Amino acid sequence: MQLILKHTQMCHYRTAGYTGAASEQFEILLFAYSLNDEPTRIIDLASGEKISDKIMEYLTDDSVIKTAYNAAFERNCINRFFGLSLKPEGWRCTLVQASMLSLPLSLEGVGETLNLDKKKMSEGKDLIRYFCMPCKPTKANGGRTRNLPSDAPEKWELFKTYCIRDVDVEKQIRNKLTKFPIPDREQELYCMDQRINDRGIMVDQELIGHAVACDLLYKETVTKK
């Protein structure tokens, strides 16, 4: 069984991965998925919709293979938002697969290179800035610091379409690359890499503190010159 995933998050979007998910502002707004190549569905979490118990069961079942472009990002954000501890063994990353074939690293770039029928929507960047990043309070927007679905219903519907399209693109990429599977040994290394990132590493905090101080001192000296 295959589950293709894509989510859209709210946080300071200049951060990503572990740092972004650790933000107090972090939340998942939209959750799009396709089960066994069925039509893509979307769950509007920001508007109060809920993920079904069955899908949550699939997420936590390592025998159900979850696929995503940059699966580490999806897995980490899902873990953070739902309080889960999803293991990398249940995931496959089409970004890793594409990289092994020297394809571009972006979803958009892979779509263009493979000449997919459906490609990533160019409107996505503006929609992400609008809904996923804090906004400047003004008189025109009523002093709000965040744009909600109710503030721009038409944009929100387009945002949902964008999220669905990303899953459709990811499905096409997965299907195009089925003849070039990630070797078992490489998948083992990927899982090891993910476990290390999940756990983190021990560092000498005193050394790090001095390194930061040296960097600041150097920048101050160069600036004065």
Model regions and ranges:
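Active-site-proximal helix-loop-helix substrate-binding element of RNase H-like nuclease domains
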Residues: 26-33, 37-178, 185-190
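Generic structural "secondary-structure junction" signal
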Residues: 15, 30, 129-133, 198, ...
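Extended, well-ordered alpha-helical scaffold/bundle regions in very large, multi-domain proteins
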Residues: 184-225
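An acidic- and aromatic-residue-enriched active-site/binding cleft used to recognize and process polar
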Residues: 6, 71-72, 208
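Entry/capping segment at the start of metal-dependent catalytic domains
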Residues: 1-27
